[in-house]
Amino acid sequence: MKFACFLAVSGLSAGAALAADDLNWPQFRGPRGDGHTTSTGLPLRWSETENVKWQTPISGKAWASPVIWGRQVWLANATEDGTELSVVCVNRETGAIERDLKLFDVESPQFCHKFNSYASPTPVIEEGRLYVTFGAAGTACVDTATGAKL
């Protein structure tokens, strides 16, 4: 759980200072897929208190990177045992959890190494839609305004 929270907080620290052309971080490694941003003034260091706008505990285990569209930060998530697969939407400004949507119940999850997670792939987001895959367990599209699974 600490790792998932750290990803969210570190991603949001950088996300809070994105330049106008980098306002959205729609995929793994950003808009161009190269991990670069044109933003300036980003923090070079942070700790539990330094350069952190907010912290939000998120249960579960996930290695996926967060994606950002407007004021929404979306995270793929899974229970430790892989029986529940979900996405979480956090408000970029306040850190409040806006949605915690269970997408799949998995009766018999496939093997997952203890150093991995059932929520490893980073989602992809565009205006109004979030796409997330959990491998053999399923792929989903979520309406980001309503939370409906499409």
Language model: regions and residue ranges:
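Bacterial N-terminal signal peptides
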Residues: 4-14
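Noncatalytic, solvent-exposed loop/strand surfaces
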Residues: 18-150
